């Protein structure tokens, strides 16, 4: 469930970074810095390079986001 005002877009994980951060390339070609949502951490959902994910972006800063779903 998206937060009010958040923008959900799909993308592909390009590289893992320290502190559970990931560089994600969106379908429109932009690259954003994303972290894992709390529920995904709670349930130990692993994210690997090349995974397809849904990223939730804030309308205030479109260069950072939160990974909220990983496709199987």
Curated annotation (Swiss-Prot):
A Pfam short name: eIF-1a
Predominant location: cytoplasm
The keyword rRNA-binding belongs to this UniProt entry's keyword annotation: yes
Keyword field: Cytoplasm, Initiation factor, Protein biosynthesis, RNA-binding, rRNA-binding
Sample GO molecular function, one term: rRNA binding
Cell compartment(s), UniProt: Cytoplasm
UniProt cross-references to InterPro entries, sorted A to Z: NA-bd_OB-fold, RNA-binding_domain_S1_IF1, S1_domain, TIF_IF1
Gene3D superfamilies: Nucleic acid-binding proteins
NCBIfam families: infA (TIGR00008)
Subunit organization: Component of the 30S ribosomal translation pre-initiation complex which assembles on the 30S ribosome in the order IF-2 and IF-3, IF-1 and N-formylmethionyl-tRNA(fMet); mRNA recruitment can occur at any time during PIC assembly.
Role summary: One of the essential components for the initiation of protein synthesis. Stabilizes the binding of IF-2 and IF-3 on the 30S subunit to which N-formylmethionyl-tRNA(fMet) subsequently binds. Helps modulate mRNA selection, yielding the 30S pre-initiation complex (PIC). Upon addition of the 50S ribosomal subunit IF-1, IF-2 and IF-3 are released leaving the mature 70S translation initiation complex.
Listed name of the protein: Translation initiation factor IF-1
Species name: Corynebacterium efficiens (strain DSM 44549 / YS-314 / AJ 12310 / JCM 11189 / NBRC 100395)
């Amino acid at each position: 469930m998206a937060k009010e005002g958040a923008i959900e877009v799909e993308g592909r994980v390009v590289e893992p970074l320290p502190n559970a951060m990931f560089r994600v390339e969106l379908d429109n070609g932009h690259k954003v810095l994303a972290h894992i949502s709390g529920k995904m951490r709670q349930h130990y959902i692993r994210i690997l390079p090349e995974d397809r994910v849904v990223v939730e972006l804030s309308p205030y800063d479109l260069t950072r986001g939160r990974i909220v779903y990983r496709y199987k």
